[in-house]
């Protein structure tokens, strides 16, 4: 099937969308979504807890259905699509990778903070030994300069990563910021590895940024049907396909079939639409990790403080994935200020 696309699309509704659903996917939902995406021609479908293998925990939120069961179901359901899984070193383990492979996952996507690529070296080595295709995620890519990001990508590629993604975890990058980073990675990696892009809609630029990435040389692009992802969601796959069709980028995905899948199958599994509301906008504007949204809203309700103010301060402090517990400290800080009569602004 590889001759069918200029760009390979990975749908991450069943991984990034897990954040929006608080990791409560059922087997029936996963089976139906995989079948619909597969029938539409989606080549890669990512399935795991929102925070990757081993993410079901007190800190990140517990899964309704064990992720390994969902990976196994997805692999058994898909006729053509390959099943990818995400893992974060320090959250997931090498044994988790082996189990995901045994359950039918064939693409291992390993994510680190954009300055910490070195923690992925052993995991890429294992994944290649297991015969898995490898993808690297450099998260929160807006926080460092393109040349520094490229140096981190080189670490992943040398470790065995076959495609390194510029990951706009906060939805904070704007067009040229995406193009500059993708171009830097393309120049650094050459033929050693492909470059990908994973965007969020927190500033409404998921699709536009993905187009900028492709024009800068990206060969793999992420999206989620109906924007089903953290924060305001990911670039909607159905819109991506429509735009790529218009500009002559082949994806192998049928526009009408993916539009039907998004409307008729994915949307019913969503607890609500992923909204570009005030909280999401502040996340994009302030550079906040998108998966913080649900955690911030929960702590804001618990302590009676504005979620928007909590998110803005999280951005000011440059919190990254894994530091969700610090939202409690910020909420308590804001509450003390409010109780003292101080004005709290964004």
From Swiss-Prot:
Shows aldolase activity only when expressed and copurified with HsaG. This arrangement probably prevents the deleterious formation and release of toxic aldehydes in the absence of the partner dehydrogenase. Residues 7-259 form the Pyruvate carboxyltransferase domain. Substrate binds at residues 15-16, 169, 198, 289. The active site is at 19 (proton acceptor). Its cofactor is Mn(2+); Ni(2+); Co(2+). The record marks 15 as: Transition state stabilizer. InterPro entries: 2-IPM_HCS-like (IPR050073), 4OH_2_O-val_aldolase (IPR017629), Aldolase_TIM (IPR013785), DmpG_comm (IPR012425), DRE_TIM_HOA (IPR035685), PYR_CT (IPR000891). It holds the Pfam family HMGL-like. Keywords: Aromatic hydrocarbons catabolism, Cobalt, Lyase, Manganese, Metal-binding, Nickel. It catalyses: (S)-4-hydroxy-2-oxohexanoate = propanal + pyruvate; (S)-4-hydroxy-2-oxopentanoate = acetaldehyde + pyruvate. GO terms for cellular component: peptidoglycan-based cell wall. PROSITE patterns: PYR_CT (PS50991). Homodimer. Forms a heterotetramer composed of two aldolase (HsaF) and two dehydrogenase (HsaG) subunits. Involved in cholesterol degradation. Catalyzes the retro-aldol cleavage of 4-hydroxy-2-oxohexanoate (HOHA) to pyruvate and propanal. Can also catalyze the cleavage of 4-hydroxy-2-oxopentanoate (HOPA) to pyruvate and acetaldehyde. The aldehydes produced by this reaction are directly channeled to the dehydrogenase HsaG. HAMAP family: HOA. This is 4-hydroxy-2-oxohexanoate aldolase. It comes from Mycobacterium tuberculosis (strain ATCC 25618 / H37Rv).
């Amino acid at each position: 099937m590889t001759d069918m696309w200029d760009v390979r699309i990975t749908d991450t509704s069943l991984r990034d969308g897990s954040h929006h659903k608080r990791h409560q996917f059922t087997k029936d939902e996963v089976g139906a979504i995989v079948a619909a995406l597969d029938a539409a021609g989606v080549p890669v479908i990512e399935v795991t807890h929102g925070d990757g293998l081993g993410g079901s925990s007190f800190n990140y939120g517990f899964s309704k259905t064990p992720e390994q069961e969902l990976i196994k179901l997805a692999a058994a359901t898909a006729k053509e699509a390959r099943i990818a899984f995400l893992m974060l070193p320090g959250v997931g383990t090498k044994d988790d990778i082996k189990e995901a492979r045994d359950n039918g996952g064939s693409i291992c996507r390993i994510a680190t903070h954009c300055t910490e690529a070195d923690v992925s070296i052993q995991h890429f080595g294992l994944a290649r030994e297991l015969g898995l295709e490898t993808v690297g995620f450099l998260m929160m890519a807006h926080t460092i300069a393109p040349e520094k990001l490229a140096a981190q990508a080189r670490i992943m590629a040398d470790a065995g990563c076959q495609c390194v993604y510029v990951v706009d975890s906060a939805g904070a990058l704007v067009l040229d910021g995406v193009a500059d980073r993708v171009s830097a990675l393309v120049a650094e990696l050459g033929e050693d590895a492909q470059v990908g892009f994973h965007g969020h809609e927190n500033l409404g630029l998921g699709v536009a940024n993905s187009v900028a990435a492709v024009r800068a040389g990206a060969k793999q692009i992420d999206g989620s049907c109906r924007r089903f992802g953290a924060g305001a969601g990911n670039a909607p796959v159905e819109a991506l396909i429509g735009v790529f069709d218009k500009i002559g980028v082949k994806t192998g995905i049928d526009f009408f079939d993916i539009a039907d899948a998004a409307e008729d199958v994915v949307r019913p599994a969503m607890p609500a639409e992923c909204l570009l509301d005030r909280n999401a906008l502040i996340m994009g504007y302030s550079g906040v990790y998108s998966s913080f949204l649900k955690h911030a809203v929960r702590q804001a309700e618990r302590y009676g403080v504005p979620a928007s103010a909590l998110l803005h301060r999280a951005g000011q402090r440059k919190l990254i994935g894994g530091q969700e517990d610090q939202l409690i400290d910020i909420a308590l800080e804001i509450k003390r200020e409010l109780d003292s009569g101080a004005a709290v602004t964004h």
